[in-house]
Each structure stands twice: as structure tokens, then as C-alpha cells.
Curated annotation (Swiss-Prot):
Predominant place of localization: membrane
Cofactor dependence: Mg(2+)
Residue ranges, Extracellular side: 37-44, 400-409, 463-474, 538-554
Organism: Mus musculus (Mouse)
Ranges facing Cytoplasmic side: 1-15, 66-378, 431-441, 496-516
Keyword Transferase: yes
Enzyme Commission no: 2.4.1.212
Keyword Transmembrane: yes
Name of the molecule in the record: Hyaluronan synthase 3
Cellular location(s): Cell membrane; Golgi apparatus membrane; Golgi apparatus, trans-Golgi network membrane; Cytoplasmic vesicle
UniProt record similarity statement: Belongs to the NodC/HAS family.
Disulfide pattern: none
Molecular function terms, GO-annotated: hyaluronan synthase activity; identical protein binding
Amino acid sequence: MPVQLTTALRVVGTSLFALVVLGGILAAYVTGYQFIHTEKHYLSFGLYGAILGLHLLIQSLFAFLEHRRMRRAGRPLKLHCSQRPRSVALCIAAYQEDPEYLRKCLRSAQRIAFPNLKVVMVVDGNRQEDTYMLDIFHEVLGGTEQAGFFVWRSNFHEAGEGETEASLQEGMERVRAVVWASTFSCIMQKWGGKREVMYTAFKALGNSVDYIQVCDSDTVLDPACTIEMLRVLEEDPQVGGVGGDVQILNKYDSWISFLSSVRYWMAFNVERACQSYFGCVQCISGPLGMYRNSLLQQFLEDWYHQKFLGSKCSFGDDRHLTNRVLSLGYRTKYTARSKCLTETPTRYLRWLNQQTRWSKSYFREWLYNSLWFHKHHLWMTYESVVTGFFPFFLIATVIQLFYRGRIWNILLFLLTVQLVGIIKATYACFLRGNAEMIFMSLYSLLYMSSLLPAKIFAIATINKSGWGTSGRKTIVVNFIGLIPVSIWVAVLLGGLAYTAYCQDLFSETELAFLVSGAILYGCYWVALLMLYLAIIARRCGKKPEQYSLAFAEV
């Protein structure tokens, strides 16, 4: 069968499959068919809930199977090309980084157990206030003939003040020379954003290495992270990129970082592990990822010059990098055997801005990703449809309940959300062997109250660019993220007041259900609050080097 015909059939097939999945979920939602229900529908279980429950069950099953496969992958690495050892370059993107985090990052890079690993750190900024990062580079990795640096007035796409065309070309050659000649190199360049920084590292390396590992400057790497990701790429030539397990370095600094830590574990070890089973991980995270350099150099220019609705894209760099690999028909994988720790926002507003930026890139890349559904397993199509449209179904459900339901319906909805969260959290406790994962059930409320409006705001402002979150040396508070959250809270409170005003007096049965549900919900929150305070009290006074992961060195 001709290749063009096969491709056309796959495109038609995956498109029809996506429509069937979306149509099925929509039909189940609209019809509201219920399998069982009590008198007056105080309690019920319907088709829509069954579909979501089945999705979680299947996702958890394949995640478990992928983890079992990972545990069997501990045999010695056999390189396909015995004549020449594989070469790897670690590219670190740095922007106004907290000095302590940067030191930890560079020290961890120095301890990576891989021979002749090349480390390239590119600093986004060449002003006087940025030189402290070069000083830290000299402190940790400098002082030997293997280290080199260059302070560049320009970058590859924008000339600095006083630069001529000749001096710009000379600067480009100097950057390449420093990177090629040095085991450890640091390039300071004119500010241009994270994508510009990553481009400089990739462009300067050219075809000098086999694989490129990416890392953020707030990341602490496990010494075995490189060899474990390399193992995945070497064992299957059809795998173009692989990501590792990203955990939180500052998880006990605040409640938001603590909840983020359990959410991170769930996202990587359940959601991405499931995607990895089918070879279609949709985002290789910036703190820990590795790509075949031969592929990366193919799409480097297209990746850098990406546009959306006529505007140049300056966020979602890692997700688009992953999508470019998928667009070539190569598989993307995840391995929990490769680990790192990374910083996460400890303040609500900074976390909200980060989530809004990630949501922007998610929806934009969802559209791009849909062009390549036909090149991969049907799971990629199915999961993209479910996760892409789920927030909109949830928003419609919440608004309908708060404006057309009863007080009991609202309380039951909250209880159901927490019940689903508890089920997922219990499975995570079993999979990880850590009771702290029970707090994953609280993240569902954070999702409902903050992430839903942030996603809508992200769609409305999808063409707004920038780093999204400020550098960590100087934290800049951006209150714009509070606007959609405030509107959402006002909508919900208005619906609650309207429902309470319109509802008739409670019957004895309704009152009993309402009081019982409220007491149960309150006890649940009190129990988790006490557990959280106990965990924090136990951690109080412990130093960072006592964290469970040995590579989290100060």
C-alpha cells in the first residue's frame, strides 16, 4: 500500500476516533444517564462518572505496568556502537537564579557519573547584575584548563550595542570555539528569553555530541540521571527523547510547595508513566530531559522560530521541543530511574503565574500535537481529547450545580471530588510507599478553585509572552493572576447565594444528609490539617542534607 494512502487512512482513522471519544463523553454528560440513584436523587452514579472512573483505572494500570518494566531495566548498559563511546552534553539555562540554587545545580552536574560529560551553561543576560552567575560558575567548575567562558554582547538573533556584522559573526564563532574546546563552559549573552538561551547551547554544540541533556539552573541532579536516560535511548532507536522523575527540592517551605510536591509525583509517576507505556510522553520537562542530537539539529530552526496566531512563541519551550520529536514519528519515554530535584514557587501568586504560563503552552501545543496523532498510538489521541476537554466539562458542571442545583447537590459534588482525590491518593501511597501522598486529595480543591480559572485566563491571554515567572534572585509579585480567580470565586459565591435563596425549606431527610455530609467534610479537612502540621513539626530543624534523596546536597 502506498505511503501516502496509509498516512491518509491513519489521519482519517485517528480523526474519527477522536470525534467518537469526544462525542461519547459529551453524550454521557448531556444525557446524564444514571445507573443507580436513591429516592429524590440524593445519591447517584451515572454513565459520565463511570467513564471518568474507568479512565483513572486504565491510566493507573498502564502506569503500574510501565513502572514494572522500568524495574526490570537495571541490567548493564550495552552501547550499540562499541567502536566509539557515546557523548553527552548537559545544557543549563540560567536566568537571575538564586545563588544557592545555582551552586547546588553546578555541584550536582559536577558529580554526574558519566565519563567526559560536557556541561554548557548559558546565562540569559550580560549586564553587571548578572555577573554573579559567572562568578559562581568559576567557583564551582572553573579553575582548570577544562573550563572556559565568554561574555557576549549579542546573541545568535540580536546584535548588542556597538556590534557590527563582522563582530557579530566573530562572536558566534567564539561561542562555538569555547563550547567545543571546554568540558565546562559558561556563555553570558544579551537577554532574549529562555528559548534564546537554549538555542545558543544547541547551536554552539552543533553535531559535536550524540545526545543533549537539558536542565534548569534551579535543579539538583542525581549522579545516575544521565546514564539512566541514555539507557532508554540506546535500547530503542525509535525513541527520540526521554524525561526523568522531577521532584521538589523545597517541598517543606510552604503549603503550596508541599502540595506541588505530591502533584509532581502523581504527574510524573502515574500520568507520564502511562504515556510512556505507549511511547507518547507529551512533555519532557525542562529540569530533566535528554534528546537525540541528530533529531534536535533537524528541527532547531523551526523550533526557535515557532509562531502562533502570527506572534513569536517565547514560552512552552520544553513542550514544543517534545512535540517536535513526536512530529517526526519518534517515540518519547519517561524513566523513574533518572531523578532530580527542582525549586517550585512557595507563594500562591507566583505559583498561580507559573500554572497560567504552563496552561498557555498546553493549549497551544495541544493544537500542534493534534497534527501528529496519526503517527502514534491511539492512546495519545484518546488522552489528549479527555484531558483537553475535561476542564470545560468541569466548569459547566460546577456552574450548573451552583445555579440550578440544591445545597445538597453542591455539598455532594465537593464530597465526590474529594472521594476521587482520596482514591487516586491512596493508589499513589501504595505505588510510592509514602503516606504523604494522601495529601494529593487536597490538590483537587486547589485545582477547582485556582487552576480552572487560570486555564480560562490562559486561553484568553495565550499570545502574551515572557518568562511568566520572575527570576529567583529577585521575586517579583504579579497580581494579575488574582483577577480570574476572584471572578471565579464571585461566580461561585453568587451561585451559592442564589441557590440558598431559591431553595425551599429542607425536609428532615435532606437536613440529615446535609448535616452528615458537612460533618464528614469538616472532619476530613481537620484530619488532614493535623497530619500536615505533624509532618511540618517533625521536619522542623532538619537540614536540607537530611532529605530522603541523597543527591540534595547543600
